[in-house]
Amino acid sequence: MKITRACIYPKDIQCITGRSERYGRRLIKEIRAYFDKQPHQFITSEEFAEYSGINIEIINNYLKQVS
């Protein structure tokens, strides 16, 4: 069984949304502020899905393909 990655990185946001990696970094900062997280804490796929409105299944399918 292959384990799916739990964290989202700017490059993932770039591939999922088609936007720039810089946009991905900015969005991660916004998500951290939204969930009141510290700069050293990771953003999970569930948090990204909730914030962006993208279905979690789409995100998990992408993460399975790239893992």
Report the location of each language-model feature:
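Major-groove DNA-recognition helix of helix-turn-helix-type DNA-binding domains
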Residues: 18-67
